[in-house]
């Protein structure tokens, strides 16, 4: 039986007593509920799927940025811009690397409720990491079933409260004035469960003009009105009253002083003010022992006010909503074995976009006033079936429509009203060879679809060297790609995992950055691109409290055809900006004991290494950014009694004090966003069973 306490009087005795205190535990199984949009063990899914569990989320950082968790997954480039006005830069297999802010080309979902609007853009900062049970990432063709997402899907799932009533409080302090405070309350009984998470985050920022403040509420109510029907209500309120924007630096400015802000950002008080509220309701009902009906409906609002470096402001007031219905079952009848899934979705986002000149960071006029809308509908289905005793297959398809609209009310500078429509028919095939109880080999292929976002059609390119114009860009086509992946999943025992995946994606009409200046970015279509690479993920419990994990990615992301942009001629073979040639993450953890959920008991320590290769910052490949290697370490102690559960921990990052580039702004004259030098954080968390 697991011990409730493991008290070791001195750090020197910790390692000597590891054999006494260590709990022999297996790795927590990665049960995937999302790869095929129905519950399925990740080992059997014909897809590249990985998850980060709560035990890692709680110690990987201050639980502010999704990059804290995603950096340890293969195929995912998660860069903390250290700029809270623009959100982290996240790409999967190179999809989404073009994003100057927010997330593109990747679908975001929180507790089953979309966190991306119909056009495909989303804000990863809206995830409540403090109360998350796990983060799942789907890469490759099976993400097609989610619609407007080429690179993959990122889902967060809130933890399920333990029986009874409990409350917790936590605080984190760190370098550059970082402070995060959180209070949580949860309760669970036979009738349902309640989880409430309230947090506040502040930082002075490492760079000049990079202070930020954020407040967040996340609440989830699980209700059971009958033995066969469950309801979930998810409420979120995310408020960022200020986030200063230091913008990017030129390579010369970065070498001179990486802490400085970009040109004109201080004098013109460049910043962003954001507020978002959302309500979602989900229902799951067992119609029979083999058939389940699921439904969801959600609505929300987001406001965004941004002051830019070239004396301008942009304001957005967005309302969004959607609904979905899904039916799944274990069989289509006695003559058709396997399981089926069919669903329909309708989503809508309407925003009032205004803009104009600014004077010293305040509004000084209006020269843009319009309504933008993104409206999508989709029908999807899949059928998973056993082909032989060792072979299983999956066939799926998604059919969808998306309409982007612009109604211009400021006509003195011309009428930029317009409408564009996109249609999607995306098939996907998957095959799994169950070679043995411990080895699965899989392959999948599909045709993906990615539309431009409202933000990407909001500006049109101007003559070379000029700032993009405020014209609705109806010339952008949707990108269409064909993806193929092959891989193996090896589970020699309950204490070790190995995943190896090779992939290739060829895209036509790739949406790429054309111009980027002073907070405005315009886009265009490139004739063709290719992404191909290899991903490896390994995890092992070595016994005596030691665990290791590693993730390796090698990727070649290039233009397959020559293209001309306002920058000049892009040669075939040029690299896609912001995508490293390779990246790696490795960690070695030790804990004197673990509970049944894999979280440490008593003392713990970890050492992490992270590296990524060179990147280019522009389509012409004239600006190159060197790769880097980073080293992080953490130590903690957790004590548990009958009613109390408390943890103290400390973490240091970039121990060797490397000067490096965290992310790049594609095709920008000042593309460099610096990474943090050596920094630290310390935290305390206490939970009481009431």
Regions from the PLM with identified roles:
Residues 166-168, 173-202, 207-245, 271-288, ...:
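Transmembrane beta-barrel wall of Gram-negative outer-membrane proteins
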Residues 187, 292-306, 434, 440-446, ...:
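Membrane-embedded beta-barrel scaffold of Gram-negative outer-membrane proteins
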Residues 29-61, 86-91, 106:
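N-terminal periplasmic "start-of-domain" segments of outer-membrane beta-barrel proteins
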Residues 105-106, 113-139:
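Short acidic/polar hinge/loop motifs at secondary-structure boundaries
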Residues 112, 383, 443, 575-690:
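Conserved C-terminal beta-signal and adjacent last beta-strands/turns
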Residues 389, 393, 401, 497-506, ...:
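Gram-negative outer-membrane beta-barrel transporters
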Residues 224-236, 273-411, 417, 432-434, ...:
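Face-selective signature of the C-terminal outer-membrane beta-barrel domain
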Residues 34, 68-113:
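Extracytoplasmic beta-strand/coil segments of soluble accessory domains associated
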């Amino acid at each position: 039986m697991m011990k409730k306490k493991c008290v070791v009087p001195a750090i020197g005795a910790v390692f000597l007593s590891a054999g006494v205190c260590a709990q022999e535990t297996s790795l927590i199984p990665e049960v995937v509920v999302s790869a095929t949009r129905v519950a399925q063990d990740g080992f059997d899914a014909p897809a590249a799927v990985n998850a980060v569990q709560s035990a890692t989320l709680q110690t990987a950082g201050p639980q502010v940025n999704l990059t804290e968790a995603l950096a340890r997954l293969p195929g995912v480039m998660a860069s903390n811009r250290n700029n809270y006005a623009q959100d982290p830069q996240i790409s999967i297999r190179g999809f989404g690397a073009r994003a100057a802010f927010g997330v593109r080309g990747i679908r975001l979902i929180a507790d089953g409720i979309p966190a991306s609007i119909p056009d495909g853009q989303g804000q990863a900062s809206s995830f409540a990491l403090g109360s998350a049970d796990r983060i799942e990432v789907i890469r490759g063709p099976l993400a097609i079933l989610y619609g407007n997402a080429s690179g993959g899907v990122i889902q967060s799932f809130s933890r399920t409260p333990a029986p009874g009533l409990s409350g917790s409080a936590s605080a984190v302090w760190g370098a550059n004035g970082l402070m995060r405070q959180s209070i949580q309350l949860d309760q669970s009984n036979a009738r349902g469960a309640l989880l409430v998470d309230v947090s506040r985050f502040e930082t002075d920022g490492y760079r000049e003009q990079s202070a930020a403040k954020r407040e967040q509420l996340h609440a989830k109510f699980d209700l059971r009105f009958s033995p066969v029907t469950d309801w979930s209500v998810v409420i979120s309120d995310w408020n960022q009253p200020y986030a200063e924007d230091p913008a990017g630096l030129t390579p010369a400015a970065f070498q001179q002083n990486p802490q400085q802000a970009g040109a004109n950002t201080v004098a013109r008080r460049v910043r962003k003010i954001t507020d978002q509220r959302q309500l979602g309701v989900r229902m799951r009902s067992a119609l029979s022992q083999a058939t389940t009906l699921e439904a969801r409906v959600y609505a929300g609002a987001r406001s965004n006010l941004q002051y830019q470096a070239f004396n301008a402001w942009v304001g957005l007031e967005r309302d969004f909503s959607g609904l979905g219905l899904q039916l799944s079952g274990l069989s289509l009848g006695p003559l058709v074995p396997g399981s089926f899934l069919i669903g329909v979705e309708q989503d809508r986002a309407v925003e009032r976009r205004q803009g104009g000149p600014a004077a010293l960071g305040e509004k000084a006029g209006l020269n843009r006033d319009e309504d933008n809308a993104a409206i999508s509908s989709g029908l999807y289905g899949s059928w998973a079936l056993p082909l032989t005793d060792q072979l299983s297959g999956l066939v799926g398809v998604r059919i969808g429509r998306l309409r982007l609209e612009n109604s211009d009310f400021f006509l003195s500078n011309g009428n930029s009203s317009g409408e564009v429509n996109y249609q999607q028919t995306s098939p996907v095939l998957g095959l799994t060879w169950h070679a043995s109880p411990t080895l699965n080999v899989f392959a999948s292929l599909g045709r993906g679809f990615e539309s431009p976002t409202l933000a990407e059609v909001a500006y049109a390119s101007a003559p070379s060297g000029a700032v993009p114009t405020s014209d609705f860009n109806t010339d952008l086509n949707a990108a269409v790609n064909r993806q193929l992946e092959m891989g193996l999943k090896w589970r020699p025992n309950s204490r070790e995992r190995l995943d190896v995946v090779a992939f290739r994606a060829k895209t036509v009409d790739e949406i790429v950055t054309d111009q980027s200046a002073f907070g405005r970015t315009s886009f265009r279509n490139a004739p063709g691109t290719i992404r191909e690479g290899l991903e490896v993920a390994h995890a092992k419990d070595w016994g005596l409290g030691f665990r290791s994990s590693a993730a390796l990615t090698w990727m070649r992301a290039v233009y397959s055809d020559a293209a001309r942009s306002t920058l000049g001629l892009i040669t075939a073979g040029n690299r896609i900006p912001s995508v490293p040639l390779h990246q790696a993450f490795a960690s070695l953890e030790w804990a004197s004991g673990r509970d049944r959920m894999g979280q440490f008991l008593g003392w713990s320590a970890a050492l992490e290494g992270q590296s990524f290769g060179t990147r280019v910052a522009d389509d012409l490949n004239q600006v190159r950014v060197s790769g880097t290697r980073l080293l992080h370490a953490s130590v903690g102690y957790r004590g548990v009694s009958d009613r109390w559960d408390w943890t103290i921990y400390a973490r240091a990052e970039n121990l060797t004090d490397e000067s490096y580039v965290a992310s790049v702004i594609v095709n920008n004259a000042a593309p460099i966003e610096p990474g943090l030098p050596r920094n630290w954080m310390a935290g305390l968390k206490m939970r009481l069973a009431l």
